[in-house]
């Protein structure tokens, strides 16, 4: 609960609504994230640009399309996004792959828990 309270107090907590009903929530936090300082068995695809992190994403059961909506919102604000998930979370891992995130390696949370780390960087070309 303290992480969620901190997200709210810091202005990093977001709710996605459909027809006036909250259907999803997530935290969108400007980096650097201390747990992303060290990555194992891989490397970040882009490690020089500022980045944001998506954390604590959840949606109501039976809700569809919210991940895409969350990503659109986040990429409008930052073109370099990192996210992590549990090894066992095959639904999230498949969604990350579907929406263009690349697996980068393993990170460890402050409590030592392992997470699989992903990144997507969208660099717009000046040649239009």
Kindly give the residue locations of the regions a language model identified.
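Active-site rim helix/loop that mediates acceptor-substrate recognition in acyltransferases
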Residues: 1-13
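Conserved beta-hairpin
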Residues: 11-28
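Conserved acyl-donor/pantetheine-binding loop and adjacent beta-alpha core of acyl/acetyltransferases
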Residues: 27-62
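Conserved GNAT acetyl-CoA-binding A-motif
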Residues: 53, 76-88
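Charge-biased, low-complexity intrinsically disordered regions
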Residues: 54, 92, 115-117
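Conserved acetyl-CoA-binding loop-helix of GNAT-fold acetyltransferases
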Residues: 59-76, 93-98
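Conserved active-site alpha-helix within GNAT-family acetyltransferase domains
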Residues: 88-105, 113
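C-terminal "cap" of GNAT-fold acetyltransferases
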Residues: 109-128
């Amino acid at each position: 609960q303290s992480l969620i309270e901190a997200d709210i107090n810091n202005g990093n907590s977001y709710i996605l609504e459909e027809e006036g009903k909250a259907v999803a929530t997530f935290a969108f936090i400007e980096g650097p994230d201390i747990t992303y300082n060290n990555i194992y068995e891989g490397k970040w695809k882009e490690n020089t640009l500022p980045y944001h992190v998506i954390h604590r994403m959840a949606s109501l059961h039976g809700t569809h399309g919210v991940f895409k909506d969350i990503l659109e919102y986040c990429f409008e604000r930052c073109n370099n996004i990192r996210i992590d998930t549990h090894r066992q979370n095959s639904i999230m891992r498949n969604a990350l792959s579907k929406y263009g995130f690349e697996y980068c390696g393993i990170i460890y949370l402050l409590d030592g828990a392992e997470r699989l780390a992903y990144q997507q960087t969208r660099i717009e070309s000046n040649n239009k």
